Swiss-Prot record:
Subunit: Interacts with translational regulator CsrA and flagellin(s).
Cellular compartments annotated: Cytoplasm
Gene from which the chain derives: fliW
Species of provenance: Exiguobacterium sp. (strain ATCC BAA-1283 / AT1b)
GO biological process terms, semicolon-separated: bacterial-type flagellum assembly; regulation of translation
Name assigned to this protein: Flagellar assembly factor FliW
InterPro entries per the UniProt record, alphabetical: Flagellar_assembly_factor_FliW, Flagellar_assmbl_FliW_dom_sf
Length: 145
């Protein structure tokens, strides 16, 4: 299957690798199906690209690489929506807000993207935990407000 993207142009994707979101990412009601496209083999970033909307894409990364003590408990409702039965079938990503200079970029730890990897269902979860929506990408600077 071919899709058009703003960042990568026209690319071929494996339809079996698409992720269906069980609820919309806030502000993007027309995008329900996404695919993760790596920015490069040596880079820890992906584009979470909408299949339905060419211009809808989010830079994401694994939050545990940037904050090793990041932890949260999913609600039973979220687990049910995603069909999560085992933790080994879950991937978590954080949306990155890119800034100039790059070192000023931040992660949204408050609202991670949770993906059940067997059935490929996704959801952006808003956490009650005290995590910031703008955590410094390097994790060493003071929190950006």
């Amino acid at each position: 299957m071919f899709i058009e993207t703003d960042y990568f142009g026209k690319i071929e994707i494996n339809e079996a690798e698409t992720i269906t979101f069980v609820s919309e990412i806030p502000g993007f009601p027309d995008s329900k199906t996404f695919v993760l496209i790596p920015y490069g083999e040596d880079l820890p970033f992906w584009s979470l690209q909408s299949i339905e909307e060419q211009a809808c894409a989010f830079v994401v990364t694994n939050p545990f690489w940037h904050k090793s003590d990041y932890a949260f408990e999913l609600s039973d409702g979220a687990k049910d929506q995603l069909g999560i039965e085992e933790a080994e079938h879950v991937s978590v990503y954080s949306i990155v807000t890119l800034r100039e200079p790059f070192e000023s970029s931040t992660l949204n730890l408050k609202a991670p993207i949770v993906i059940e990897t067997k059935e490929r269902r996704g959801k952006q979860v808003i956490l009650d935990d005290a995590y910031p929506a703008r955590y410094p990408l390097g994790g060493t600077k003071a929190e950006v407000r």
